[in-house]
Each structure stands twice: as structure tokens, then as C-alpha cells.
């Protein structure tokens, strides 16, 4: 009986750790915790969604509500610089990676703090993401050059360094406190 109980507890623990890797939102907002918002736009200025970053116990919870985007699976990341200059949003820099890890949740030396689950956009042009990144801080996110939420043209393979082969940048928004 004791072995069965231990096996069940082990399976439950593995199941909960899998929640973190699949993008399930597990953070509880802190009383008085900081919040930042990024309004996402395409290169032609079309509004395609809103990302939020909310301080939670032990990390930051990131959410995205996307609209008017091309159907399919798209890589999504937090990038190091709070700039979204068209046409390619290259000014957003690379992935937010204050801990110096490799890219991807499937990489044994990863992930970056800016690595998020893929964004799945339905035929109605809508999709959502919700994930808590343990150890991430609002001070790091909202540093002197801020940060940006970027959506890519292709899916992230969750492994290839530095960007998961996720293609060009199709939407970008700069995080602002408040």
C-alpha cells in the first residue's frame, strides 16, 4: 500500500511539473504586486492583442489575448528591448534571458525566461497564452530599456538555440508599467 501511495504521489508531482512546461497558468497575484501591459500590433499598425505581465509569488504571470491574427501555431517570446520598430521588429532584440540559459523548454540547458508556449490561433483569428515564469522579476522586465512581447510567423520547436526556428516577427508590443 505504501509503495502504491508513493507511486501515486510521484505521478502527481510529474503531472504538476508538466503543467508548467505546457503553459498552464499557476501563479497567484500578489497583493500590491506590479503589473505591465503590452498592446500588440503588426508592422502596418493593426491592433492584434494585449499581453499582461503580473507579479506573482516567486515569478511573473504572462497572459496574451490575441485577435485578428493568422490561424496556426506561432512562437511567442518576451524580448529584451522595449522597441517594436516596423517592418520586422528587430529592434526588440533577442529573447529575454537574464539567467544565460539556452533556448527552449525541451532543451536540457534551457529555457530562457522569455520562452513562452506556442500561441495557437484558431480560424477566428483568436488565441490565448497563460503561463507563470518562476524566478522572473518585474525589475528585470521593466529595466531601463524595458521589454517586448513578440509573436513569430512559425511554431517554436522548443529546442533550437537561440530562437526555436520560429521565423519572422509578425506582431510586437512594448511592456509599460501600470
Language model: regions and residue ranges:
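Sec-dependent N-terminal signal peptides
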Residues: 6-12
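N-terminal leader/targeting pre-sequences
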Residues: 3-4, 20-73, 78-178
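C-terminal motif of bacterial Sec signal peptides marking the signal peptidase cleavage site
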Residues: 15-18
